[in-house]
Structure formats: C-alpha cells, structure tokens
Design a protein with these regions (language model features):
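Terminal low-complexity/charged segments
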Residues: 1-164
C-alpha cells in the first residue's frame, strides 16, 4: 500500500481509529486495518465506512471459545484499503446488530449466519432461514467441543499491540 493510499485510509477511518487493533500487512492478514468492536460500536463504524465509499465484501462467522466471532470485510474500488471489523457475540446472548439497513447486501449474509450459528440480528428486515429448513432446530456450524480461543487463531501481536 502506498503512503498516499495509507494516508487516505487513515483519514477516512479517523473517527474510529481509537477502536483500531491492527494496521495490517495485507500479504499476511488480507486487511489493511482491523478492528475488534463491541456491539454498540458496529453500526456507527459501518455507517462511516459506507459514507467513505466502502462496500461490503462478506460477513463470516467462526465458533470460538469466547462466542461467535463475526467478521465483516469491506473494501473500496478507488483506493486500497481493505478493512475487517470483528465482533464477538457471547453464546448467552447470540444477538448482534443488523447492518442490512446500511448495506442491503448484508441481508443474505446475516440470514446465513443466523442459519448456521444461531446469531439473531436485531432490526433485520426479514430474518427467515436462507439455506436451511425452517424446522431444522440446529445450527450446523456450532461446535460441540474443541473450540479454539481467539488468541490461538490470531497472532497475539495482532490482537494486542496492533502489529501484524
């Protein structure tokens, strides 16, 4: 990433820089910036990315020891700047805010995450099952045992001091 592109990325994300956990080496992490957010921080951060011209690439879920890790990837066409927003949803709550009102493409991603992990997205316009039968009664990507901690999945330096 050129210094000009990095400067632009930093300027675009200035309002949420305090939340930033890593500035990435794209070749290692696949992202130029990574953020671990609380549920209340997600919608404002996503709205900022939308206003700065980012688009939603995907939403993925991972069952880890701390809960369901939801990873949101954003990018833009006019400059390098892939951003990852991460939100850990506790097993007890299994609720996350929906971003479908900001990025309509999130609709299907959130429905898929609900199907496979049981996460309910609050304020989602229509959280009916996307791929699985309505009456299945299980969430097939939840693990029964051997959940790994976030610390074992991500390099510790990426989670703590912002270096990748």
């Amino acid at each position: 990433m050129s210094s000009e592109a990095e400067s632009r990325l930093l300027a675009d994300l200035a309002p949420i820089q305090a939340l930033r956990k890593s500035s990435g080496d794209y070749s290692e992490s696949g992202s130029h910036a990574s953020f671990f957010l609380q549920a209340g921080q997600l919608v404002p951060a996503v709205r900022l990315l939308f206003e700065q011209g980012y688009f939603l690439e995907d939403i993925a879920g991972v069952d880890v020891a701390e809960g369901i890790l939801i990873v949101y990837h954003f990018d833009r066409y006019d400059a390098s700047g892939r951003v990852a927003l991460r939100l850990t949803v506790p097993y007890a709550a299994k609720k996350a805010p929906s971003i479908a009102a900001i990025f309509s493409g999130a609709d299907w991603h959130e429905r898929e995450c609900c199907d496979f992990f049981g996460v309910e997205f609050e304020n989602h316009p229509d959280l009916k099952p996307l791929l699985l039968p309505d009456d299945l009664g299980i969430h097939p990507l939840l693990k029964d045992k051997d959940r790994k901690s976030l610390f074992s999945l991500l390099p510790l330096r990426q989670m703590v001091d912002g270096k990748t």
